[in-house]
Amino acid sequence: MTTPRWRLILNGKSAGNDELRDAVGHWRGQGVQLEVRVTWEDGDAERYVAEAIDHGVDVIVAAGGDGTLSAVAETLAHREELADALPSLALIPMGTANDFATAAGIPTEPKEAFALIGQATPHAIDLLRVDADGTQWWCANLASGGFGTQVTVETDAGLKKMLGGLAYVITGIAKLGRIEPITARLSGPDFAWEGDFIALGIGNGRQAGGGQQLCPQALIDDGLLDVTVLPELEGEVTATLGQMLKSGTQAALEQLATRARLPWLEIASERPLTLNLDGEPVQARQFRIECVPGRVRMHLPAGCPLLGG
């Protein structure tokens, strides 16, 4: 039997985690050839993924939050090989919010998350390809704009380390009453929307910003992206955002949002618009976002809510 070869790409912020260290030791004891690489700066994930492919690794394990997952997935997506010819992808949730992992039902314990590699045949999943004023990006989970993006971008790193997802809520409450709507034009196949919005979600996955379920019905294997637009609500803004922060976005979105499910979406804004791509703020006036079906293969739990079949 061939020895399993896994490569762990670990966000440097979690390098001292004892549970992860124990999990690595456990799987090495089970006969897995498991090497660890730690990211400290931009470009590390790309370099480590290329190295893993050159070494013939079977599985690349991203250990970190949504940004780490996205960085590894983006590097795989940039490759010329098809998904079947690339290493499969696994995730150990170790970020602040872990939005993708939460929605997918991936265990938070490192040893259990590692176990999915052996228990679950990898599924082909979609990724979002984003063109921002001519520059290409990839997004594994969700692109968001408006209020949620401002909260995520402006939340203090120290606060996130101390309070986890609660830090986003505190920052959001502090910003209530200071939210300026964004004017944009959105278009896609048989879809057009123009006006002022306070929140925008384009989902491969379902949630971002520490649990904001902007695209609650999104699937990562349907070849489509889910769009949710929350328009400007004039005098109701503060009350509505307060409800979203206290009880989650679901109730407010059901009544107020415009939704669509599309293979691609174009966004045009007269002023520079910031989209948060899995934690990476990207600013442009013109965006084109496409769902690329089955771009990578990922180990996910049985009954994963993000899979349609």
UniProtKB/Swiss-Prot annotation:
Residues 1-134 form the DAGKc domain. Binds 1 Mg(2+) ion per subunit. Ca(2+) may be able to substitute. The active site is at E280 (proton acceptor). It is found in: Cytoplasm. Its main location: cytoplasm. It comes from the Bacteria. Mg(2+) binds at L219, D222, L224. ATP binds at T39, G65, D66, G67, T68, L69, S70, A71, T96. Keywords: ATP-binding, Cytoplasm, Kinase, Lipid biosynthesis, Lipid metabolism, Magnesium, Metal-binding, Nucleotide-binding, Phospholipid biosynthesis, Phospholipid metabolism, Transferase. One of its GO terms (cellular component) is plasma membrane. PANTHER family: LIPID KINASE YEGS, SPHINGOSINE KINASE. This is Probable lipid kinase YegS-like. It comes from Stenotrophomonas maltophilia (strain K279a). The lineage of its organism: Bacteria, Pseudomonadati, Pseudomonadota, Gammaproteobacteria, Lysobacterales.
